[in-house]
């Protein structure tokens, strides 16, 4: 299953991370719908708003179905046929949707039949492993392996469409297959857009943590086909729904257990052997500053906005091809950052908020 995610990037940086090619091969950035509803967070839970990609054709009848929109949507699908005036009164859980029953349950079959497919964006997701012989559960952060590309430059250098994709050399966002629906309050009011994340059996690498995982769309082709309901039928799109082994993970602190905790500490690897958090060195602090390019809260007029050109970049010496995890607790790229120069620089205090 998938019940907690992280999506901390500020809006402009998230947009650049979603650069794509349209059907004509032109580099594009997706446009936003209801951008003010997006609230970055290291610790997103159901009923919060998360950014999703969807086809522009859902909003404009004559649009090219390969063109994309980013829209914040409520996590937890509210069916269009729901009759109550309060969506929180929905009596069943729609946070996730099992792939093996998606065409059996009305809540998911109807919007899927209308082409309401979306891609849920996240840095990664959290999952909890039940510790044998105890009631305790160990949380893990799960994400795409971060691979060094041939791209160069900085985010601030993206001064033309041709450069948008070339300069994005940062964290690869996790792209999860979702279904959305549109609910209109019986008494009138704004339409509520909400989504569910499709889940599949866990891949071998995650099976020790949990028996289910999100349906991850690995690569631009898979994302394009899932979104393009104008050209790709439901039957063809469902062939994209399957487990993937192209993931990595590391153990994190129990700080993430409380969804009100919203700091980079939620993502920081912990050492399960000594049961303590890896202390943050100067290098890891710079990494955490990148994770916190902007405080994960709604825009505050009192706080000057950081210029795009000031957003730190991943150093090429750390952006190496990450091997698939061979054992539980592999921390991958984040752990390399947190461990580097541990003994060479003064220990910095870790950010924490309750």
Swiss-Prot record:
The keyword Protease applies. Keywords: Autocatalytic cleavage, Chromosome, Covalent protein-DNA linkage, DNA damage, DNA-binding, Hydrolase, Isopeptide bond, Lyase, Phosphoprotein, Protease, Ubl conjugation. The modification Phosphoserine is found at residues 160, 295, 322. Changing residue 81 to E: Strongly reduced binding to single-stranded DNA. It is found in: Chromosome. It holds the Pfam family SRAP. Residues 292-354 are annotated as: Disordered. One of its GO terms (biological process) is protein-DNA covalent cross-linking repair. InterPro entries: SRAP (IPR003738), SRAP-like (IPR036590). A motif (PIP-box) lies at residues 332-338. The active site is at 2 (nucleophile), 127. This is Abasic site processing protein HMCES. It comes from Homo sapiens (Human).
């Amino acid at each position: 299953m998938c019940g907690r995610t992280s999506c901390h990037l500020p809006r402009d940086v998230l947009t650049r991370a979603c650069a794509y090619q349209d059907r004509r091969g032109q580099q594009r950035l997706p446009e936003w719908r209801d951008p003010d509803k997006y609230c970055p967070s290291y610790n997103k839970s159901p009923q919060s708003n998360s950014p999703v990609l969807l086809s522009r054709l859902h909003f404009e009848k004559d649009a090219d179905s390969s063109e994309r929109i980013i829209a914040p949507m409520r996590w937890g699908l509210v069916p269009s046929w729901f009759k109550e005036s309060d969506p929180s009164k929905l009596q069943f859980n729609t946070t996730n949707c099992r792939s093996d029953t998606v065409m059996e349950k009305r809540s998911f079959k109807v919007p899927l039949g209308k082409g309401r497919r979306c891609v849920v964006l996240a840095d990664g997701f959290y999952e909890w492993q039940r510790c044998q012989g105890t009631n305790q559960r160990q949380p893990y952060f799960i994400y795409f392996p971060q691979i060094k590309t041939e791209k160069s430059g900085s985010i601030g250098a993206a001064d033309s469409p041709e450069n948008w994709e070339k300069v994005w050399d940062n964290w690869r966002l996790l792209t999860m297959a979702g279904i959305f629906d549109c609910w209109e309050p019986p008494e009138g009011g704004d339409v509520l857009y909400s989504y569910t994340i499709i889940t599949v059996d866990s891949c071998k690498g995650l099976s020790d943590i949990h028996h289910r995982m999100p349906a991850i769309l690995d690569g631009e082709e898979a994302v394009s086909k899932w979104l393009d309901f104008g050209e790709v039928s439901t039957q063809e799109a469902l062939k994209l729904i399957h487990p993937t082994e192209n993931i990595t993970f590391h153990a994190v602190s129990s700080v993430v257990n409380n969804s009100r905790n919203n700091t980079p500490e939620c993502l920081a690897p912990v050492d399960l052997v000594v049961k303590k958090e890896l202390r943050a060195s100067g290098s890891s602090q710079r990494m955490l500053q990148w994770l916190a390019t902007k405080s994960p809260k709604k825009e505050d007029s009192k706080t000057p906005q950081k210029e795009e050109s000031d957003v730190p970049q991943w150093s090429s010496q750390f952006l190496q091809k990450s091997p698939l995890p061979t054992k539980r607790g592999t921390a991958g790229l984040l752990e390399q950052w947190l461990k580097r120069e541990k003994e060479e620089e003064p220990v910095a205090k870790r950010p924490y908020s309750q």
